[in-house]
Amino acid sequence: IVVGSFGKTFHVTGWKTGYCMAAPELMKMFRQVYQFASFCAVTPVQMALATFMQQHPEHIEELAGFYQQKRDLFNSGLKNSRFQFTPSQGTYFQNLDYSAIRPDLNDVAMCTFLAEQHGIVAIPISVFYQQAPENLRLIRFCFAKKDETLQQASAILSAV
C-alpha cells in the first residue's frame, strides 16, 4: 500500500489532496472506508492536479534535484552550527541532533525552547515512536520552503 500527498510534490500544501495505491482488492476496501471518512473531495483541485501532471510530466523527474538543492542550501547554512546531522536522502526533511547544545532537554522541550526563544519551529522525532528512546535528541525540519526561509532558519539555528 502506498499513501501519499500531492502537497509538497506539486508545491500546493494547502490543497490537502493525496492518493492511495494498492492491489485492487485492497483499493475496494479503501474506497469503502474513504466514503465514510471524508465528506467530499475538492474536485477542482483534483482536476487541476491531473491537468498539471499531464502537461508537465518532467516535474516529477526534476523533483529530486529540486529538493536536493533545498537540502544542500539548508545544510550548508548549518555547517558552522553545533547541530550534528547526516544529509537526508529521499525526503524533504532533515533531522538534527542537538545533543551538543541542550542535552538536558528532551525533543519536545527542545522544540518548545526553539519556538519560544528563537521563533523557529521543529518537529520532535519522538512523535513518530510508540515509545521513544530516552536519550533521543533529534528534531526534524522540513526544507520544502522558500530559499529565503531556509537561509533565515539556518542562520537562527547556527546562533543557538
Regions found by a protein language model. Give the residues of each.
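PLP-dependent class I/II
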Residues: 1-160
